[in-house]
Regions:
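Conserved N-terminal entry element of GNAT/NAT acetyltransferase domains
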Residues: 1-24, 44, 198-200
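Conserved GNAT-fold acetyl-CoA-binding loop/helix
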Residues: 37-60, 69, 96, 103-106
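Conserved beta-strand-loop-alpha-helix junction that forms the acyl-donor binding cleft
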Residues: 125-134, 160-169, 185-191, 196-197
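Conserved acyl-donor/pantetheine-binding loop and adjacent beta-alpha core of acyl/acetyltransferases
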Residues: 88-126
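A short helix-loop-beta-strand connector motif used in the catalytic cores of GNAT acetyltransferases and
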Residues: 60-73, 90-94, 123
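Conserved acetyl-CoA-binding loop-helix of GNAT-fold acetyltransferases
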Residues: 135-149, 171-175
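Conserved GNAT acetyl-CoA-binding A-motif
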Residues: 121-122, 150-161
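Conserved beta-strand in the GNAT
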Residues: 73, 79-88, 123, 128
Length: 200
């Protein structure tokens, strides 16, 4: 390299930082969870019409399914532009009770929903990237960061469920090393159960 020669900087490709979430990221995590649930009817049934506020409170709390403690975010120029949240499937009942405690307080009821995960897998619950930052590889980076953290904490399998009617999301997960292991019904939707196994 020629001394003092300036490096080429692609100003069209912003620098993306992948980092553990902080409590102040709770609102961004709430948007991720809302987008993952997707269906507004399901959101209202789950946590009421003021669902973003309720999900933000859940994300700010400790010991809930969507706690900031379980999330990893993508940051660009000081703004969170994507996040992934998940937890040890063996802790579903414990974390769901923490989540339901907020729902009882805010909404006055809790939903009757099936278990989305179980012991034996680290569950990737929700993933989203802001529309204007999609197709930059951020989703893949978040998935891999989540999997690496899970594997470093002793997980052998990372699991998730994806709507059978969302082939684009499914293709993303399959491209990142996930494979089909079964099907489940969740929020009245047929879901494909995928897992990625820790490399030997």
């Amino acid at each position: 390299m020629t001394p003092n020669k300036p490096l080429f900087i692609n100003m069209n490709k912003p620098e993306i930082i992948i980092r553990p979430a902080r409590i102040e990221d709770a609102a961004a995590i709430a948007r991720t969870v809302a987008e993952a649930i997707g269906d507004e009817v399901a959101l209202n049934n789950y946590c009421g019409k003021d669902y973003l506020s309720v999900l933000t409170e859940i994300s700010r709390a400790e010991g809930t399914q969507y706690s900031w403690q379980h999330a990893i975010v993508a940051e660009c120029e000081g703004r969170v532009v994507g996040s992934v949240v998940g937890y040890d499937g063996a802790k579903l009942a414990e974390l769901r009770e923490g989540t339901f405690a907020v729902l009882r307080n805010r909404v006055g009821r809790v939903p009757d929903i099936a278990d989305e995960t179980e012991a034996g897998e680290h569950y990737l619950d929700s993933l989203s990237v802001a529309p204007q930052y999609q197709r930059l590889g951020i989703g893949s980076k978040l998935i891999n960061a989540f999997c690496q953290r899970a594997f470093s904490e002793g997980a052998v399998h990372v699991g998730l469920i994806v709507d059978a009617e969302n082939p684009n999301a499914e293709r993303l997960y399959l491209s990142q090393g996930f494979t089909h292991v079964g099907e489940r019904i969740f929020f009245d939707h047929k879901m494909h159960h995928l897992q990625r196994t820790k490399p030997r």
